């Protein structure tokens, strides 16, 4: 059953994992959605599923592509602007992950383009579609702050995104800008990080979603949060 929320969110990386789980939750709560992902078939499957609940525009493409970002901005204008942007799309890099002294620099540049530059580029493309008080959620990782051996490429990119979020918040007090660590999850990206390992003991992405919903619908100040800690602190939503 949907609620009466009259808001629109754009979610990148929304064809599976955390992005899809969040999209489903917001659709059930009455949010209109603009969804992005690189894989067109999976994204269209998601759109077909969620269109039974709410208005959904699905735009396949790569957030590192300027033309794709313009398409996202056009869709945001068609829906009357945005109350929220969730920068969830990211890439791990090589699997298994190399140590930094062995990391191919051209590959590392690609990780930074997707995980750091693209989220900012998306926001620049959408700046005139953001409504006053809009929420920006940049999905980071505990690898941004913990020096896990072998996680230098991905972790440092998420550290850069976390600091970018903090500065963006300081520069735009009219917006609420969050970086959020969703915690370990049973996702394809996490499986890529641990090739050959059974990750069935990791929580499903759905367990982190209530924390993200709290950021999107609550009254928390800009800052960095841990999604599952928010769930416990707020008693769920």
Question: Where do the model's predicted regions map?
Answer:
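Active-site-adjacent segment of SDR/Rossmann-fold oxidoreductases
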Residues: 129-130, 146, 167-176
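Conserved glycine-rich Rossmann-like NAD(P)H-binding loop of the short-chain dehydrogenase/reductase
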Residues: 29-46
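Conserved glycine-rich cofactor-binding loop
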Residues: 15-16
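Active-site helix of classical SDR
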Residues: 123, 157-160
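C-terminal helical subdomain
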Residues: 175, 179-182, 187, 195-237
